[in-house]
Structure formats: C-alpha cells, structure tokens
Amino acid sequence: MAPSHLSVREVREDEKPLVLEMLKAGVKDTENRVALHALTRPPALLLLAAASSGLRFVLASFALALLLPVFLAVTAVKLGLRARWGSLPPPGGLGGPWVAVRGSGDVCGVLALAPGTNAGDGARVTRLSVSRWHRRRGVGRRLLAFAEARARAWAGGMGEPRARLVVPVAVAAWGVAGMLEGCGYQAEGGWGCLGYTLVREFSKDL
C-alpha cells in the first residue's frame, strides 16, 4: 500500500474503542522487550538479587523469594508504559488525536501531539501507533509527515522561534528508531532508571 492511498483526519467518536485497542496492542508488543532490557542491566540484577536474599528470610519458598521481585519489577515497567502510551489522550493544544485511514475506510494508525513543556521545545508526539496488520506499508511515515506539518503550522501560529518535533521511542522499538533516523531525526537524551535509558527521544528541526 502506497502512502498516497492514506488520509489522515481527526478520530471520530465511534472509532475511539478501536483506536484504544490499537494503542494497547502497540504497547503490548514492546513492553516485554523493554522489561527484559531494563531487568538485565547490572544494577537491576544486583537489586533483584538483594531483594531475593532479603525475602528468603521472610518467605518459606526459595522459588517464591527468587521470582517475586522479578514479577513485581516487570509489572511496574509494564504498568508504567501502559499508563504513558496505552490510553487515548484528550484533544491537546495542537488538536487531534488523528487516525490514518485507508481508502477502504480501515483505520490503520493513530497519532497525538502536544506542545513542549517550555518555549522553544516545539511539539511532542505523545502517541504514535500503527496496527500490526498495516506495518511496513508507509503508515508510520505518513503519520510522521502529518505530525511535522502540524508542528510547523503550530510553531508559526504561536510565534515560536523554531519549529521542532520530538518523538519518544522505547529502547526496544528498533523499527521506529530506524524510520526516524532515516527521516533525519537524531537521538537526544531520553529517560529511564538506574542510569540506563528505557525511552530515547528523537528530535528534528523542521
């Protein structure tokens, strides 16, 4: 499917349940890889080992003392990602959310934007997800191009000194990172825990 066969418009009320499921599916595809990446870093392994050792004095089961800290840590990572990306945000200062729609009317992607925290930060992508049945068909690039156009228009209307778009990407989402780098984005910082990055932020001056 060529990108020219796609249109982008604001989500309709009757489409919101479908879009919400798309967002949840997108998070589910990456949360296990992010959790694995986070919990195999040396500081995390050290903390898990210390927690397991402490629990062995409280719990009668060695296996439970070993697995409980891992289960709780994985759950915390998953809940954090779901809270951040697994819900449909309300309309923001840049409008939206928007959906990518095929000519047949099938919703195949979702996008949401928000202004940056400080003046000059530009716009931020807060949601970007493509249905697993429509990936590698130009949907992500079409949504990204639409986001860039909205960011430029918003920056001009607000008198911002520059038009800029920031896209956060989970560390395990190599396909999205590759697409952004191919479109001229550069990784600049991110956030995580214990000194290790879990989400990288890609930015581009438009």
Curated annotation (Swiss-Prot):
PANTHER family reported for this sequence: GNAT FAMILY N-ACETYLTRANSFERASE, N-ACETYLTRANSFERASE 14-RELATED
Protein name per Swiss-Prot or TrEMBL: Probable N-acetyltransferase 14
Membrane topology of this protein: Single-pass membrane protein
Organism: Macaca fascicularis
Keywords: Activator, Acyltransferase, DNA-binding, Membrane, Transcription, Transcription regulation, Transferase, Transmembrane, Transmembrane helix
SUPFAM superfamilies linked to this entry: Acyl-CoA N-acyltransferases (Nat) (SSF55729)
Gene3D superfamilies: 3.40.630.30
Annotated transmembrane regions: 57-77
Gene from which the chain derives: NAT14
Function statement: Probable acetyltransferase.
Subcellular location as annotated: Membrane
Entry superkingdom: Eukaryota
Disulfide bonds listed in the record: none
EC number: 2.3.1.-
Annotated GO MF terms: DNA binding; N-acetyltransferase activity
Entry's family note: Belongs to the camello family.
Enzyme class: transferase
Domain N-acetyltransferase residues, every copy: 55-206
Stored InterPro entries: Acyl_CoA_acyltransferase, GNAT_dom, NAT_camello-type
Main location class: membrane
Example of a GO cellular component annotation carried by this entry: membrane
Keyword hit for Transcription: yes
